[in-house]
């Protein structure tokens, strides 16, 4: 390697790890710190955990070094790692992200698995508030012969979901639509799913800074006075646009499970099942339309 080439490669990954650890050790849990490190070197250097174990003295380019150092600054500012790298994994699929869409959560994976385990085939499925497309794309990927549609309220969000459908090689019909101003449809769905905003503004004080400062509030929070506002709209729409004996799946705020179930019963849904997430919190509901 020439002297000129040497100038392009100045830091080893081990040296970067030491810098990374020293900067962030007081801010990030040790186990999480290592996960973040390996996520970053895989993203920016295409260097896996095993590659690092076998050769931590690998020299990175100046561009890679700058990207990695910039990522430290972002993490120190409490930006979620998923926004730092611009992507995340969900249901073993890769989804591109920016801060116009929520970061998909493990609880939502549980909701998706519930739908998949119910083995819907040859169904028309609607995802209301699709965001990154994580629910719609995953259902299209893992269910047989289902037509999946995703709705959201802005072109920017639809573009992200569309890109994620393309990346994961699935066909999802993505449409601009606002459930608070539902449009008339002349057809009905077999399955409707939604993970709507459900955190009250009173609960905002308990939300971590990296969520509160970076994730889109419009996808997170509802007014204290009407915490079920989106559920009311979704249930009314589902009453008109779900087929008889069609399925409704929703993610919920654990503090309002009884109220959501009562609302479903009042709207005429039956066989209502409440399911806990991996943290043992009431998190998702399945119901059937009469």
Question: Language-model segments: what does each one mean?
Answer:
Residues 3-68:
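A short N-terminal interaction module
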Residues 40, 78, 108, 135, ...:
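Residue-level signal for inorganic ion chemistry
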Residues 43-114:
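Conserved AdoMet
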Residues 82, 199-202, 255:
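Active-site beta-alpha loop architecture of Rossmann-like, nucleotide-cofactor-dependent enzymes
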Residues 94, 147, 171-173, 270-273:
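Conserved beta-strand segments of alpha/beta enzyme cores
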Residues 107-206, 233:
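Conserved SAM/SAH cofactor-binding pocket of Class I
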Residues 198-229:
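Mobile active-site "lid"/loop adjacent to the S-adenosyl-L-methionine
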Residues 224-287:
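Conserved Class I SAM-dependent methyltransferase catalytic core
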């Amino acid at each position: 390697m020439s002297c000129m080439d040497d100038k392009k490669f100045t830091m080893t990954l081990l040296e970067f790890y030491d810098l990374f650890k020293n900067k962030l050790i007081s801010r990030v849990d040790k186990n999480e710190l290592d996960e973040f490190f390996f996520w970053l070197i895989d993203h920016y250097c295409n260097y896996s955990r095993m590659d690092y174990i076998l050769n931590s003295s690998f020299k990175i380019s100046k561009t890679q070094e700058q990207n990695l150092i910039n990522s430290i600054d972002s993490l120190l500012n409490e930006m979620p790692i998923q926004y730092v790298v611009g992507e995340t994994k969900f249901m073993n699929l890769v989804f591109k992200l920016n801060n116009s869409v929520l970061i998909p959560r493990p609880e939502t994976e549980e909701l998706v698995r519930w739908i998949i385990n119910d083995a819907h085939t040859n169904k028309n499925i609607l995802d209301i508030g699709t965001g990154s497309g994580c629910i719609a794309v995953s259902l299209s990927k893992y269910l047989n012969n289902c037509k999946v549609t995703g709705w959201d309220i802005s072109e920017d969000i639809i573009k992200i979901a569309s890109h994620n459908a393309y990346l994961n090689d699935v066909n999802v019909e993505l449409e601009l639509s606002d459930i608070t101003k539902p449009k008339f449809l002349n057809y009905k769905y077999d399955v409707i799913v939604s993970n709507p905003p459900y955190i009250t503004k009173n609960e905002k004080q308990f939300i971590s800074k990296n969520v509160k400062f970076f994730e889109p509030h419009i996808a997170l929070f509802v007014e204290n006075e009407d915490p079920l506002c989106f559920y009311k709209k979704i249930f009314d729409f589902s009453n008109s646009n779900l087929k008889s004996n069609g399925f409704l799946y929703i993610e919920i705020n654990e503090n309002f499970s009884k109220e959501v179930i009562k609302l479903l019963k009042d709207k005429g849904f039956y066989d209502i099942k409440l399911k806990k997430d991996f943290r043992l919190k009431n998190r998702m509901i399945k119901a059937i339309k009469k």
